Amino acid sequence: MRRLWLVALIASLGAVANPAAAAGAKFDGSTPLLCVPIEITECDEGGKCYLGTAEEVNLPQFIRIDLKEKLLRGVGEAADRTTPIDFLERENGRMVLHGGQKGRGWTAVISEETGKLSATISEEGTAFIIFGACTAL
């Protein structure tokens, strides 16, 4: 029984480490993506930067990206937090998304092959650099 549990744990960790394999296909936009911000750096206009968690910088822990609806939405308790996708481009195996609202602008790049996420959010005096992972739902 213990060995079965260990095998299940290793398989789960492998799925998290390689979201494209867990999804079984490249991301084609036909289904929404679930993304997790893993590493977040917050920088101020003075050049000081701090590593933080999603909770510490007031970001949802899970973000649903729906390309058909052109919408980013928090998951769970953050489900009421949304932002429209104003621009979407696919090139060289990457999806590039842009948007903005309430005085903030954001950009995200998602690898269609691996699901790796790189994103920025900027507002007056502050910027966030986010690295994470996405998987197709």
Describe these PLM feature segments.
Residues 1-4:
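Positively charged n-region of N-terminal signal peptides that target proteins for export
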Residues 18-22:
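Sec/Tat signal peptide C-region and signal peptidase I cleavage site
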Residues 53-55, 123-137:
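Edge beta-strand at a domain terminus
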Residues 67-105:
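Contiguous, well-ordered beta-strand patches that form the walls/edges
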